[in-house]
Amino acid sequence: MEISIFTVDAFTNLPFKGNPAAICPLSHALRDELYQRIATEMNLSETAFITKINPSDNFTTGSRFCLRWFTPTKEVDLCGHATLASAAVLFQHMKNMNPTVVFETRSGDLSVTRCGEQIVMDFPLNPPTREDPKEFKDIIKAAVGDHPIQDVYLSSSTKKLMIRLADSCDRSVLTSLKVDSTTLLSSERSGRVTGLIITIIGSPDCQPGYDFYSRYFAPWNGIPEDPVTGSAHTVLASYWLEKLGKRKMLAYQCSSRGGELELEVREDGRVNIAGRTVTILQGTITL
């Protein structure tokens, strides 16, 4: 059996930037064990599998597909950058003719629309709730040390804990944080947290005018630090909407690779997440 596979850098227009995802378009479903083995072999933060809903469907003309995401260690419920990358494979390599395609996922139907050089994802918004920092003092200490914090929020729906550093901390403080995966894992074992967001307010008056910055860590899912994380921005968009009063925001994730996301929080409680992609590898898996 041969399976086509693509490596796509998401949330960037430059190769070797953004967040790489492996994408496999499949004519039929595989065994769960095989999905996981392929994802482990690829060893990227996520490998996504696009599957035809019906055998008679066509990648060029079809408008609905199944989509699943796997880290090197487990299947996850939502992944933004691999969704963006999956849409890019359909639009650019499978020559899908539709302006919008819908992915059936564990997080419900996700629609993705091509818009010029960008792809826009329609994602659920995941509003976090304020938490007492004392409840998470160990993970806060492990993540940010003695740097002052302003807010601690938790998205129970995504199990993402968000720490906002005080406004006295600038981008250089955020990028200089040395977050150790082993220490994070040992500091949080309750199961309430499977991802950690650290964020600071941006500098919208300075070009290109980022409204906020962030980093994201998920060693609980086998990902020490994720380069650019669409799903984390379903939490961040809700939080910063409340703090900034802006529905349209420009965000930057400050990993070593870095990536830019355009956000629009809609009145219906969902968020549009837009970004670009670059395909850097196309090949075949032989099984």
What are these language model-derived features?
Residues 1-78, 84-287:
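Active-site proximal loop and beta-alpha junction motif in alpha/beta enzyme cores
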